[in-house]
Structures are given as C-alpha cells and as structure tokens.
A protein has these predicted regions:
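N-terminal leader/targeting and accessory segments in enzymes
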Residues: 1-96, 100
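Phosphate-binding loop of NTP-binding sites
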Residues: 94-219
Length: 219
C-alpha cells in the first residue's frame, strides 16, 4: 500500500478547505506516515493521530504518543510536546485522510448505498443475495456488506453494533474487500452518518432511498 508523508496530508486538508494552522510541523513535512488512527489503543510507530470526540482527554493523547504517535490532528491544541495540525472540522478531516491512507479503495469497487427510515437492512440483504447469485454463476467473489446486522469484507466477518461505522472503518472495509478480490459492496447509510461526515468521501455507484410511509415512524 502506498504511503504518504505529513506534507501530503496537510495539502489534502488545504484542498478540503479545513486546514486552520500547523504547529511545529516544519521538520516533519517529509516524514512518512505509516498509520492513521483515531484509537489511542491501536497505534504504532510513525502514527498520525486524529483526535475526535468531545470527551477525549489529554492523557489519551499522551498514551498514544508513548506508543508511537508523532503528530496529531485536532480542532484544538493539547498540552503535549509533539507537532499538531489544527483543522476546522475534525470529522471531515478523518474522512478525507482515511480515504487517502487506504488509497481510495472505494473507487475500485462497485459501492451501493441504501438509506431511508425503514427497510435499509432488508433491502441491503436482498441486493447482496442477488449479487451473490450472479457472482456464483460467474465464478466471482461474493458481495461485501456493511450493515446494522453484520459486517463482511472478505477479511473481517462480525456482528455489527452500529448501522454505519466511522469513516476510517468504512475505508478499511473497502480496502479489505478489494484485497480479497471482491467487486461489489452494499452498505446501509444512516441519516446520522450523512450528518457527521462518515460517508463524505464515499463515492457511491448506486444510491437507494427506501420510502415506507408510517405516520408514527418518527414518534
């Protein structure tokens, strides 16, 4: 997988018009980023860390630094002695940097998104079943799925606990599906995920909106 340096991530944030300021980054501009992460417990050497969440604490970042973080991206500066990249929208930053880190895998997949108040899961699995039958007949890999029921990408297969995962995890699943030789992926897209930029850098080949009228559905 192609790796990028700090300068290239900063340029990306500039292009997205969300870069606010860089602090003490001059000497690390050419340093390669081996991992982008938003989980302080899942970092390694040469990690660019994305600070998100209103409840994030300074000690979480210090723990991450001890484990290999050398620069962080945040909406606010923390009391730590490493370079930082300040942005105006951390969720958008996580989304675009995640897509770049995984080398935009969604662009090489046929991605189908299913949104709507009711029927997202049912519609998603109908589509997966149809595509799986086609793939079987053509001697191709089955269809990846991201849903509120479970997630399957050819590498990971687990029961889901959320309808649409964080943007970083979406692009990780895309990368896994591509690595596994899959061509198609169908996913549920919640209204919340649209609101908080989780799918901001997902380019859907097909978008489906389910409409089921029920006067009590929002009560």
């Amino acid at each position: 997988m192609e790796k990028y340096n700090v300068k290239e991530y900063i340029e990306l944030l500039k292009q997205e018009d969300i870069l606010k300021e860089t602090i003490d980054c001059e000497k690390i501009m050419d340093k390669q980023v081996d991992l982008v992460s938003y989980n302080s417990k899942e970092v390694q050497e040469n990690t660019l860390f994305v600070v998100k969440g209103a409840l994030f604490k300074n000690e979480y970042l210090k723990e991450a630094i001890d484990n290999g973080v050398f620069v962080y991206v945040s909406e606010n500066k923390f009391d730590v002695d490493i370079p930082c990249i300040l942005v105006t929208d951390i969720r958008k930053a996580l989304s675009c940097m995640s897509a770049m880190y995984f080398n935009y895998p969604g662009e090489s997949l046929n991605v189908i998104g299913v949104g709507g108040t009711k029927g997202k899961s049912t519609t998603t699995y109908y589509i997966k079943a149809i595509l799986d039958e086609y793939s079987k007949a053509m001697n191709k890999k089955d269809t990846a799925v991201i849903s509120s029921i479970d997630t399957y990408d050819g590498v990971e297969n687990f029961e889901s606990h959320i309808t649409t995962p964080e943007s970083y995890d979406i692009h990780r699943h895309f990368a896994n599906a591509l690595k596994s030789g899959m061509e198609n992926l169908v996913m549920e897209v919640s209204s919340q995920s649209l609101k908080i930029e989780r799918v901001a850098d997902v380019f859907f080949d097909i978008g489906i909106f389910t409409v089921t009228y029920c006067p009590l559905s929002r009560l």
